[in-house]
């Protein structure tokens, strides 16, 4: 792989420590990426330990296969972590996993490689798919979606307040010629944005929304969290690193729901609530963020938030 696209793993030591790895434990890395967390975790495992990695990205799978060839304790699977439950059941591991790690979002190699089509800074084909062999590309969505749908994606997933204005500009321009390149789309969005945020590219939010939609990131996260909980053994750890407020909100609400049971929806004076609604998770500590040293070494870690929970039942 080109060194230009090197990935710096975020919250590396913190995430591995949060898993509280046992030498003979069984662990899942739901977002293998370039293997930073997996390699660090393998260093903590003994000869009886096992680690199963997941990723949709073909380039990540190549890296994972190389690691599997080096270390027989590791196996890589080309699946979304949303399908974690199916894989775990097929391997007879449901309820037997000691820790699950999810490091969400897009990796540096994906962002920095223009050919992947994620970046508004480097021109490339307008793709944005984590797995280029599955689903529709960003270009296909932009070419076919109604103006209202484009605006919804920008607003709901990108939290872009000028979503309608941007969608209108895109639909008007596509009547002349289709959008095929990231720079072309970024230029139209930038012109349509009347109020640029200081220190942020005017296309940032729209591109985030488009990427999340194309990859069904939030839907996959909800499915993956449910599957992770079922896969864990009692005492197993769930560690999730998110990079924007939409992801973090889903993670926070999921952990709180299972830490407090469903009792939040019932009257506080209901006498049987504590007996009927037993928590399945215990929240461990407060959300963790990158240290000052990590922020200096890797500015992309500035938005990272890590949450940790332990399975109770």
Swiss-Prot record:
GO terms for molecular function: rRNA (cytosine-N4-)-methyltransferase activity. It catalyses: cytidine(1402) in 16S rRNA + S-adenosyl-L-methionine = N(4)-methylcytidine(1402) in 16S rRNA + S-adenosyl-L-homocysteine + H(+). InterPro entries: RsmH, SAM-dep_MeTrfase_MraW_recog, SAM-dependent_MTases_sf. GO terms for biological process: rRNA base methylation. It comes from the Bacteria. Its main location: cytoplasm. GO terms for cellular component: cytoplasm. Its EC number is 2.1.1.199. The keyword tRNA-binding does not apply. Keywords: Cytoplasm, Methyltransferase, rRNA processing, S-adenosyl-L-methionine, Transferase. It is an enzyme of class 2 (transferase). Pfam families: Methyltransf_5. It is found in: Cytoplasm. S-adenosyl-L-methionine binds at residues 35-37, 55, 81, 103, 110. Specifically methylates the N4 position of cytidine in position 1402 (C1402) of 16S rRNA. Belongs to the methyltransferase superfamily. RsmH family. This is Ribosomal RNA small subunit methyltransferase H. It comes from Pseudomonas paraeruginosa (strain DSM 24068 / PA7). The gene is rsmH.
